[in-house]
Amino acid sequence: MSGVADTTHAPRLPDPLRLGRVHLTVSTLDGSIAFYQRALGLQLHDRDGRVATMGAGGEDLLVLVEEPGAAPGGRHAGLFHYALLFETRRQLARAVKRLASTQTRIEGASDHGVSESIYLRDPDDNGIELYADRPREQWPPSRIPGERVEIFTLALDMEDLMREVDGEQPRARAGAGIVVGHLHLHVGDVEQGLAFYRGVLGFEVMVNLGTAAMVSAGGYHHHLGFNVWLGSDVKPRPPQTAGLREWTVLLASREELAVVRARIAATGLYVRADHGGFVVRDPWETAVAFRVR
């Protein structure tokens, strides 16, 4: 990351912080809209040519940008998965019931200690996680010095989860209150990822597994994960490839936005003004937008 100052001990990002819209490249907009409506119960909020926004009736969650003929994601940096956070365990169970009723393939189901998660993919192979958090006081503390929580992976007790919706019929639409909870990225080097996301942007390290790390603001288990599971030499996402175009960090005020922007710019990183906020890129050209919520 040449030209960027060493800011290993950069000030932390302000709390409260949460994530906003996830921008995805898709190959066929009509097909993607149909998938997200049918499988996830999302609503089409707006469509303008080859761009559509979708959500659960409140704020936009996804911005889908059509690039006809875009190839599925392959072995490159970028999206591992984005994660939609449900307000309650019952809402997550309703989402699973909808997936079953629409015969949507579930790739995995995991108990992470801090949360319960369902994994699937959209038609362009973009990874999706649907999850519900356990109460914060139930999050397992880490036994490793310097780490905040323990995030493990066990098989999810699906039978117990589905007891939440015994007797209910599948619901065509997702309930309100869904937000983007976190993202997980493929990167080429975890330490370089930490130098950027902790040292430049100001996230706090929650977990460091060597081949993967998880960072957050305000003590959340993670707003972002990144890993080298595709290899340590992955390159940026090629043009005309489906995947992540941009993800969004939402700050509480314009004053906070200005402070964070000035601090990041002082490291020498290029900061581009955009729609009342700003955008920066990580070492693998993944775009991160900062805006006021």
Roles of regions detected by a PLM:
Residues 43-77, 127-134, 204-242, 283, ...:
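Conserved short beta-strand elements that form part of the metal-binding/catalytic scaffold
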Residues 1-69, 76-84, 97:
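An N-terminus-focused feature that recognizes amino-terminal "leader" regions
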Residues 50-134, 138-145:
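Active-site-adjacent scaffolding segments
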Residues 39-45, 199-205, 265, 269:
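Conserved acetyl-CoA-binding loop of GNAT-fold acetyltransferases
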Residues 1-30, 81-84, 135-191, 244-247:
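N-terminal beta-strand motif that seeds the catalytic metal site of vicinal oxygen chelate
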Residues 18, 48, 78, 114, ...:
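Exposed loop/turn and edge beta-strand positions of beta-sandwich/beta-sheet ligand-binding modules
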Residues 3, 16-20, 24-30, 83-127, ...:
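Vicinal oxygen chelate
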Residues 36, 172-216:
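Conserved small-residue-rich
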